[in-house]
A protein has these predicted regions:
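Glycine- and aromatic-enriched membrane alpha-helices
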Residues: 3-40, 44-488
Length: 488
């Protein structure tokens, strides 16, 4: 039976996310005759410009809520599972890079995010990202705490009238992004941060940095592409996930300082097969990360294809540069290059075609490789190159989105602010809009991360002792060891 969202016009919090989105639907899309184009508008808007932009104005006659679409909702659920798989993939990827005495601790930092953020997102994180009660361009409200009234009594109500995705499926999908983002930061801090400090950092960073960023970009905030907003576009998380985690990693690594034995006794990765396994799982999961962000099974082929194409270009570019410069392509380089290409295409996946996808993957990979080598030259201890891959790769991808975005994939009906920028200033104008969004993200995330770490450091401390660092954090933090010392 079709369901409708309860009226909330009289609510002291004002219109809900569903009502606000419905207003946009009835005001802007009513004149679009092609049903497939109308549908694409919902998906493109949700993925790139913010699911609940605050448009204002009187809504037209309310439409009866249609049942959720089985194929599209299945894509959402399958995409959620794929994105969740990325976090164990990241654990293997990071774990392979560390010394054997720290591999469990490194992997646990990613796995623990699945537990902590998985609960935190349901309790309050989703609400801070997507509820519109505060009517703020910076952060959501508290009306959706505990996912209250999200999905209706049976959990099958659509996200908005006529929208084929259920609200619960959307909340689940977005929660997977919230889980992996702080896990990405851990790569800069492994082998020296205490697990207690990591617990508190994950909690506060997710609430005070990730959820506001998600709101500002996707939840109707000022960085989005809806009418009256900045006009920046981010298809699946170039700013929200990759730049945010990369900048946080850079700041955190600088505040923590280097490992006690670094760089005098740098060790090679202890398990390269782990790195390759992790990269493969990340690549596979990225189909959900980018592809399912289209929210439509019939039109998801484009971001699926641009995603894997950019990954291939990134891997090839990294290997060719190594081959030319060092004489041999490495397995670690192949894995890292693929991830760099995936990071680069994330903000652009639904806005570009194949040629630009190859260019973005290749250029992001090259930029990340240069950044990794600069880091080594200046001896900065970002342990696993988190900023160099996610910060630099995300920045490169976000800026190149401005250069390569196709007007056909950024229509004015669905991305009014971004389309206006493209119309008045072309791709160069969109490039500078993207640059403004990137610079804001750098500043906001850097300042917020520094404050969070300063408070945690004053309260419980940040680092383990030099003796504990020498012993290894597997045993110190967890009382376990990955390998039998008699056979290792």
């Amino acid at each position: 039976m079709p369901r409708t969202f309860p009226s909330d016009e009289a609510s002291p919090r004002g219109p809900s996310a569903a009502t606000t989105f419905h207003r946009f639907r009835t005001q802007v899309l009513a004149g679009v005759q092609d049903p497939q184009l109308r549908r694409f508008g919902f998906f493109a808007l949700a993925a790139g410009a913010g699911l609940i932009p605050l448009m204002g104005g009187a809504a037209k006659a309310a439409l009866q809520a249609a049942p959720t679409d089985g194929a599209d909702n299945t894509l959402m659920l399958f995409g959620s599972a794929l994105v969740l798989l990325m976090t164990p993939g990241l654990a293997f990827f990071y774990g392979g890079f560390t010394r054997s005495k720290n591999v469990l601790n490194t992997m646990m930092m990613s796995f623990f995010s699945m537990g902590l953020i998985g609960v935190l997102w349901v309790v309050i994180g989703y609400s801070l990202a997507f509820d519109t009660g505060f009517k703020s361009p910076f952060i959501g409200g508290l009306g959706a705490m505990w996912l209250n009234n999200v999905g209706g009594p049976l959990g099958d109500a659509p996200l908005a009238p006529g929208f084929p995705i259920s609200a619960t499926s959307f909340a689940l999908f977005q929660g997977m992004f919230a889980i992996i983002t702080p896990a990405l930061i851990s790569g800069a801090l492994v082998e020296r941060i205490s697990f207690k400090a990591w617990f508190w950092f994950c909690l506060f960073w997710s609430l005070l940095v990730y959820s506001p960023m998600a709101h500002m970009v996707w939840g109707g905030g000022f960085l989005g592409a809806a009418e009256g907003m900045m006009g920046a576009i981010d298809f699946a998380g170039g700013t929200v996930v990759h730049i945010a985690s990369g900048v946080a990693a850079l700041v955190a690594a600088a505040i923590l300082g280097p490992r006690t034995t670094w760089p005098n006794s740098k060790k090679p990765p202890h398990n390269v097969p782990f790195i390759l396994l992790g990269a493969g799982l990340l690549w596979f999961g990225w189909f959900g990360f980018n592809g399912a962000s289209m929210f439509a099974s019939k039109t998801a082929g484009l971001p699926f294809l641009t995603t894997t194409t950019a990954a291939s270009a990134g891997m090839l570019t990294w290997c060719l540069i190594e081959w030319f410069k060092d004489g041999k392509p490495t397995a670690v380089g192949a894995a890292t290059g693929a991830v760099a290409g995936l990071v680069g295409i994330t903000p652009a996946a639904g806005f570009v075609y194949m040629g630009p996808a190859i260019a973005i993957g290749a250029l992001a990979s090259a930029a990340c490789l240069i950044a990794v080598r600069i880091k080594a030259a200046i001896q900065f201890d970002d342990s696993l190159d988190t900023f160099m891959v996610h910060g630099v790769g995300g920045t490169t991808g976000a800026l190149l989105t401005g250069i390569f975005a196709s007007k056909a994939l950024v229509p004015a009906d669905y991305f009014p602010a971004a389309a206006k920028v493209l119309e008045s200033g072309g791709n160069l104008g969109l490039f500078f809009t993207q640059l403004k969004a990137v610079l804001f993200t750098y500043g906001f995330v850097a300042i917020a991360t520094a404050i969070i770490l300063w408070i945690i450091g004053a309260a419980v401390g940040l680092r383990v002792s030099p003796e504990e660092e020498e012993r290894g954090l597997d045993f110190v933090a967890h009382g376990e060891e990955a390998y039998d010392p008699m056979t290792n």
